């Protein structure tokens, strides 16, 4: 099983999935602004193929500010200032990874292309309304994504930040995957244990131990 199409393609035929797409389409057609744009809703899967996944970082729902979201958890489009949670992720990286330099942008495509699946548990949101699509059915789909990664792949690293992600990943088999948990990097909770969690170096330690290529967490300084 190498591709997302092989792994979860059948989900797209399921009535619940068709219902999600209908609800999102209706919201767009009613004139509401929905993020990310239609062509970027599934960017995480396009940029990180199923057999290339080495690390999974779970987010919640997309950023709901103007032109921030582009389909990757925690990432923003070029030209958009890194949001507070991402600023804190960079802070932790700068203390955890020797030589890490904080980029001026928040565009995390460089991680996605190395096998870091940046997966939000809900894939769409209405502008200015956090969690507005939380009941659309996306959670069923992303549960299935995590389930198939858990079953069909070995030696993945799951980074679960905050109670929502931890609850979502509670069924992951800890005997064949590495599961790292901490509080969410949001300014509300980062000081409770996200700072100092060293998840990025621990990820590479685990990958190295299993003779897998480490992640180069350094991003280009500018985009």
Curated annotation (Swiss-Prot):
Q: Which UniProt keywords apply?
A: Cytoplasm, DNA damage, DNA repair, Hydrolase
Quote the subcellular location field of this record.
Cytoplasm
GO biological process assignments: base-excision repair, AP site formation via deaminated base removal
Its GO CC terms? cytoplasm
Keyword Cytoplasm listed? The answer is: yes
Coiled-coil spans are: none
Its main localization is cytoplasm
Q: Which CDD domains match?
A: UDG-F1-like
One GO molecular-function annotation for this sequence? uracil DNA N-glycosylase activity
Presence of keyword Zinc:
no
What reaction does this enzyme carry out catalytically?
A: Hydrolyzes single-stranded DNA or mismatched double-stranded DNA and polynucleotides, releasing free uracil
The residues responsible for catalysis, as annotated, are 61 (proton acceptor)
EC number, UniProt record = 3.2.2.27
* InterPro entries to which the protein is assigned, alphabetical: UDG_fam1, Ura-DNA_Glyclase_AS, Uracil-DNA_glycosylase-like, Uracil-DNA_glycosylase-like_sf
Q: Which Pfam families match?
A: UDG
The Swiss-Prot or TrEMBL record describes its family as follows: Belongs to the uracil-DNA glycosylase (UDG) superfamily. UNG family.
Q: PANTHER family from the entry?
A: URACIL-DNA GLYCOSYLASE
Q: Which HAMAP family match?
A: UDG
Q: Give the protein's function.
A: Excises uracil residues from the DNA which can arise as a result of misincorporation of dUMP residues by DNA polymerase or due to deamination of cytosine.
* Name the UniProt record assigns to this protein: Uracil-DNA glycosylase
User: What high-level taxonomic lineage is stated for the organism?
Assistant: Bacteria, Pseudomonadati, Pseudomonadota, Gammaproteobacteria, Pasteurellales
């Amino acid at each position: 099983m190498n591709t997302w199409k092989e792994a979860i393609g059948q989900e797209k035929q399921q009535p619940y999935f068709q219902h999600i797409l209908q609800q999102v389409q209706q919201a767009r057609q009613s004139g509401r602004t929905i993020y990310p744009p239609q062509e970027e809703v599934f960017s995480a899967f396009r940029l990180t193929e199923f057999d290339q996944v080495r690390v999974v970082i779970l987010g919640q729902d997309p950023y709901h500010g103007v032109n921030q979201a582009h389909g990757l958890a925690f990432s923003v489009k070029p030209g958009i200032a890194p949001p507070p949670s991402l600023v804190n992720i960079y802070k932790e990286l700068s203390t955890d990874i020797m030589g890490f330099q904080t980029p001026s942008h928040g565009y995390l495509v460089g991680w996605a292309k190395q096998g870091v699946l940046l997966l939000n548990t809900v894939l769409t949101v209405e502008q200015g309304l956090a969690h507005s699509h939380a009941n659309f059915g996306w959670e069923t789909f992303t549960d299935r994504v995590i389930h198939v990664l858990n079953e069909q792949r070995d030696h993945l690293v799951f980074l679960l930040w905050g109670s929502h992600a931890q609850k979502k990943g509670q069924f992951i088999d800890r005997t064949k995957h590495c599961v790292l948990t901490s509080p969410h990097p949001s300014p509300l909770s980062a000081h409770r244990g996200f700072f100092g969690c060293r998840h990025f170096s621990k990820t590479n330690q685990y990958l190295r131990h299993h003779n897998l290529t480490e992640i180069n967490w350094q991003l280009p300084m500018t985009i």
